[in-house]
Amino acid sequence: MQVVFTKKAPPQWLLDMWKEIDDKTFGQGFDCFAEDAVCNLGVSDWKGREAIRANLKAFIDTGFTAMHHVTEYWDAGSLKVFRGVVDMTPDDPSMTTVHPTMTHFFYMDETDDTKVRHWVGAVGPVTFG
């Protein structure tokens, strides 16, 4: 199977999701996920939109603020690829902000192509000090 990617501006659903994380609100921006979506970030294996939302919130609540930056976005229809950088600023002022690279694959739902069915991503390395 051959897949053709087109470089595009990031879609609003992606920007809205990152904004929810950056603002620590975890609200409607997560509606881009199918109700039974799966998320594999690093070693995570979260099943369901609400589990994705809750686990990301728990991770962010460990003591830092994130700010996501989109470097590039590629669209191949049912597969979307995003690359960027996230600024991770610790709540503890004695610790240094880090800027790990991110790469994410979003596999869209077969019956509703406005929803993410499977999110696979990597961020890092992430080390504070």
What kind of feature is each model-predicted range?
Residues 1-4, 16, 54-129:
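A beta-strand edge to alpha-helix "cap/lid" segment located at domain peripheries
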Residues 30, 49, 53-56:
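Short, well-structured alpha-helical segments
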Residues 1-27, 31-32:
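Short, low-complexity N-terminal intrinsically disordered segments enriched in polar/charged residues
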Residues 33-35, 102:
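Residues that flank catalytic or metal-binding motifs in active/ligand-binding sites
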Residues 36-47, 59-62:
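A short gly/proline-enriched turn/hairpin at secondary-structure junctions
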